[in-house]
Amino acid sequence: MLKITIITLGNKMPDWVNSGVNEYAKRFHDGIQIKLIEIPLLRRNKSSDLARILEKESALIKDALPANARLIALDMLGKSFSSEELALKLTQLQQISSHLCFIIGGPEGLSNEILSLCDERWSLSKLTLPHPLVRIILLESLYRAWSIINNHPYHK
């Protein structure tokens, strides 16, 4: 069984975000387990020490990292994939690890410390995306790749 953990920073999401995440998570067959870990976003204001906030959030992310998982940071400077390339990449990753962990940062992204812990950096887009939407786009992209691998009609 392939486990996919998504660690994300954020506070209570709107219902449409939760609905989108749940919709794609339930589409995967029994051989894939999806787990979402939501770490509360620390409060920010105009006088916030953003470096200190990033450091604290990094510690929370590190505490949530699953053991023996392949760590993949979502980062604007990461590698991007077409749907077909992502399907091939997932096939390759399943031969390396039975547990993939995707990490989505907060408004300032991920710290260098977290990025250095990751095995890979992926980008979903060159655009800056709202972090709640990234959850849905990631799951849809993974589901589309899964459908390509399994010749499921979703991708057609």
Swiss-Prot record:
<keyword id="KW-0489">Methyltransferase</keyword>
<dbReference type="Pfam" id="PF02590">
    <property type="entry name" value="SPOUT_MTase"/>
</dbReference>
<dbReference type="InterPro" id="IPR029028">
    <property type="entry name" value="Alpha/beta_knot_MTases"/>
</dbReference>
<keyword id="KW-0698">rRNA processing</keyword>
<comment type="subunit">
    <text>Homodimer.</text>
</comment>
<dbReference type="GO" id="GO:0005737">
    <property type="term" value="C:cytoplasm"/>
</dbReference>
<protein>
    <recommendedName>
        <fullName>Ribosomal RNA large subunit methyltransferase H</fullName>
        <ecNumber>2.1.1.177</ecNumber>
    </recommendedName>
</protein>
<comment type="function">
    <text>Specifically methylates the pseudouridine at position 1915 (m3Psi1915) in 23S rRNA.</text>
</comment>
<keyword id="KW-0949">S-adenosyl-L-methionine</keyword>
<keyword id="KW-0808">Transferase</keyword>
<feature type="binding site">
    <location>
        <begin position="124"/>
        <end position="129"/>
    </location>
    <ligand>
        <name>S-adenosyl-L-methionine</name>
    </ligand>
</feature>
<feature type="binding site">
    <location>
        <position position="74"/>
    </location>
    <ligand>
        <name>S-adenosyl-L-methionine</name>
    </ligand>
</feature>
<dbReference type="InterPro" id="IPR003742">
    <property type="entry name" value="RlmH-like"/>
</dbReference>
<dbReference type="GO" id="GO:0070038">
    <property type="term" value="F:rRNA (pseudouridine-N3-)-methyltransferase activity"/>
</dbReference>
<dbReference type="InterPro" id="IPR029026">
    <property type="entry name" value="tRNA_m1G_MTases_N"/>
</dbReference>
<feature type="binding site">
    <location>
        <position position="105"/>
    </location>
    <ligand>
        <name>S-adenosyl-L-methionine</name>
    </ligand>
</feature>
<keyword id="KW-0963">Cytoplasm</keyword>
<comment type="similarity">
    <text>Belongs to the RNA methyltransferase RlmH family.</text>
</comment>
